[in-house]
Amino acid sequence: MEQQPSVPRSCTNVARETPMNLNIQSTTGTRYELSVPPDETVDGLKRRISQRLKVPKDRLTLLHRETRLSSGKLQDLGISDGSRLTLLPSVEAGLMSQMSRPEQSVMQALESLTETQVNDFLSGRSPLTLALRVGDHMMFVQLQLAAQQSGSSHLQHRHVITRGAETSASPQYRTLHTSTSAVSHLASCTPGPTPPTTLSPTSSTHCNGPHSSPLTTSVFRSHGEGVAVSPCAEQAPCSTRGTEGTSSSPSSRSRKPGAIIESFVNHAPGVFSGTFSGTLHPQCQDSAGRPRRDIGTILQILNDLLSATRHYQGMPPSLTTLRCHTQCASQARNAKATSPQSTSPQQTTHPVGHCQTQTRTYKPSGDRLRQTENRATRCKVERLQLLMHQKRLRRKARRDSRAPYHWMPTRKSSRTSSNSSTSSGEGSLEIDFEDSLWKPDVKAELNSEFVVA
């Protein structure tokens, strides 16, 4: 009995890894082929179709032999090479289409990204721009990551944050400042329970922790066309002034996953930029501590930033800076008035450090913020009312200029007061005979023979 030659395992593996070609046919008449791996799932197939058609994945329905595909692997559902699938795009009407949530808009924007865009963004090769629509508002968010080689003595990036329970450094993300000469930026020191802040008119100064690790930085910009974003080129060691603590314990360096907004600048109506720092969640990291190449990592960064805005109710940097300078000047005058003889450096630098810390922790209450928003809304309404009133006056003047008779603007209004029966003669017409109702522009010359007595 002859033995049949055995097929090598490599050949079987290649045969198993051969992609499947699926025929996708929509109800609108569109037909195309799609190549997928043999172990592809229904969710992955919907994601591929949504990327190709630019349609949200939730609005796609797939049918195979009149069976709706909801979850599971394609092979387990009897789908093989050459199978035909029917695509049913779901259509919403009425008020349901307006009830889209912000997180659904974010997920739809992230699911439309290709794997190449996600990999290039997370590796720092190219920026990522997302167009998000929340209700009637359109928001553009641009993120930029920049990796740094570890092992150097000087860290050119600004933040080092470790995991909550570990001592090894974890991947970071951080927004860069918008470098403009007219805007003051806030800089922070990472280690220490009460980090001091310094004010700089053109650039921001950051300090670094003792651990060196690969860092990433990101840029957050909302509707930021025309705003130049660049990293800060100035580096300075961290130092505290006055009676602030200069040493930090190892437990204070550890931070929980999340983001903290450090500064926020409003450049123009609808154009914002700021600085936030944070650490990634352990679920978004691989075994080596690097960010996972997945849209979940981008979604985690956006969620951390949106969560940080709820806790950040700070004033604009210009007002905060002005408030800080005023308080510092008043404290300096009080210190000079109480002790004019003693002018030691410690006494002069203490109010500055106190003012900087107070600026960092200053947060107005929610009632003050609501009052400011209500005042701005009230001003807008009054402005619109004024414009509408001026428009009505112009329309009336235009209508009066085209009229055949020009009525005097100073005439008194005539009113009639009559009873139910006007034919009885009880009604009276109140007319002011001192001013005539109509005065011609040209005075007519009447002779005596034309006047009828």
From Swiss-Prot:
Supply the Pfam families for this chain: ubiquitin
What's one GO-annotated cellular component? nucleolus
Keyword Cytoplasm assigned to the entry: answer is: yes
Q: Does the entry feature the keyword Nucleus, yes or no?
A: yes
- Which InterPro entries has this protein been placed in? Midnolin, Ubiquitin-like_dom, Ubiquitin-like_domsf
Q: Which PANTHER family match?
A: MIDNOLIN
* UniProt protein name: Midnolin-A
Q: Which compartments is it annotated to reside in?
A: Nucleus; Cytoplasm, Cytosol; Nucleus, Nucleolus
Q: Where is the composition biased (Polar residues)?
A: 206-219
Which residues are in the Ubiquitin-like domain? 20-94
**Which residue ranges are recorded for the region named Disordered?**
184-219, 232-256, 333-376, 390-429
SUPFAM superfamilies per record: Ubiquitin-like
- What is the organism of origin for this protein? Xenopus laevis
List, as start-end ranges, the regions of compositional bias called Basic residues. 390-399
Keyword annotations: Cytoplasm, Nucleus
What spans are recorded as compositionally biased (Low complexity)?
Answer: 239-252, 338-351, 415-428
Give me the segments passing through the membrane.
none
Q: Where is the composition biased (Basic and acidic residues)?
A: 365-376
This molecule's function is given as: Facilitates ubiquitin-independent proteasomal degradation of polycomb protein CBX4. Plays a role in inhibiting the activity of glucokinase GCK and both glucose-induced and basal insulin secretion.
